[in-house]
Amino acid sequence: MEVGSKSFATASKLFDAKTRRSVLMLYAWCRHCDDVIDDQVLGFSNDTPSLQSAEQRLAQLEMKTRQPMRIQMHEPAFAAFQEVAMAHDILPAYAFDHLAGFAMDVHETRYQTLDDTLRYCYHVAGVVGLMMAQIMGVRDNATLDRACDLGLAFQLTNIARDIVEDAEAGRCYLPAAWLAEEGLTRENLADPQNRKALSRVARRLVETAEPYYRSASAGLPGLPLRSAWAIATAQQVYRKIGMKVVQAGSQAWEQRQSTSTPEKLALLVAASGQAVTSRVARHAPRSADLWQRPV
């Protein structure tokens, strides 16, 4: 996790040992699936590229993910997922919802509207929030909705941060309707002369994430205190990255936006207070305007 997700690595240290083990095993499976689809190792180029097509690799992931529900697995990532799924009663549908997000990449899905982008965010991150919440003992739908909201917010932030990197890899998760409003297309959005217009799209995406971050905060009381602290820390770190993207404007993609170690520590301290006060604060009902996960 230190290599694959530095933003979440700090937060993960705050879980109790049992929860952290399960979280890391779930992460290992998610990371493995991502790497297999992209033919990478921990997000980096593979020295021995696969001879299979992306479609074939996706089919193998689906087959191997289905097997843990029935037989003993020996491949590390799938053995880890098997242990987590059985220990925490993770719904098989969640695992396949996650794989559906990779299928969207494989099939080069186009995203016309914000709703389309949010559907992608659900598959690659929102459903991971659901599985994480189940690891932490959550079973009620209201808290699961908030966990999904946090995943959506995380992915919206990731998309804003990685717009140019994704475009260079031939991927675009921005709503085409938003791009059209700025006179951009998926083919020219990463051109240096378009950075000012692109920064406005990124700002809009970060602003879209805000109500999902707020909604997620209302789910913290439904978690054990240490888990609430860990999740609040991750929430604050990712939100800070989105703020940096906005603050950097057209320069946001000159370097990868991230938080420094001192910033992470400050956010960790702030999150401890957030986790505690969330238990006595009044939380508004979840807004009907937010994207609703499939149930």
From Swiss-Prot:
Q: How is the cofactor bound?
A: ATP is required for the transferase activity but it does not seem to be hydrolyzed during the reaction.
Regulation acting on activity, per entry? Significant inhibition is seen at GGPP concentrations above 100 uM.
Q: Which Pfam families match?
A: SQS_PSY
Keyword terms of this UniProt record: Carotenoid biosynthesis, Manganese, Metal-binding, Transferase
Q: Which residues form a coiled coil?
A: none
KW Transferase (keyword) present: yes
Any one Gene Ontology biological process term? carotenoid biosynthetic process
- Comment on pH dependence: Optimum pH is 8.2.
EC number in record: 2.5.1.32
Question: Which co-factors does it depend on?
Answer: ATP; Mn(2+)
Could you tell me what reaction this enzyme catalyses? 2 (2E,6E,10E)-geranylgeranyl diphosphate = 15-cis-phytoene + 2 diphosphate
Origin: domain of life: Bacteria
Query: What's an example of a GO molecular-function annotation for this chain?
Result: squalene synthase [NAD(P)H] activity
Quote the function comment for this protein. Answer: Involved in the biosynthesis of carotenoids. Catalyzes stereoselectively the condensation of two molecules of geranylgeranyl diphosphate (GGPP) to give prephytoene diphosphate (PPPP) and the subsequent rearrangement of the cyclopropylcarbinyl intermediate to yield 15-cis-phytoene.
Q: Which NCBIfam families match?
A: Phyto_syn_CrtB
- Give the family from UniProt: Belongs to the phytoene/squalene synthase family.
Q: Quote the protein name from its UniProt record.
A: 15-cis-phytoene synthase
What gene is this protein translated from? crtB
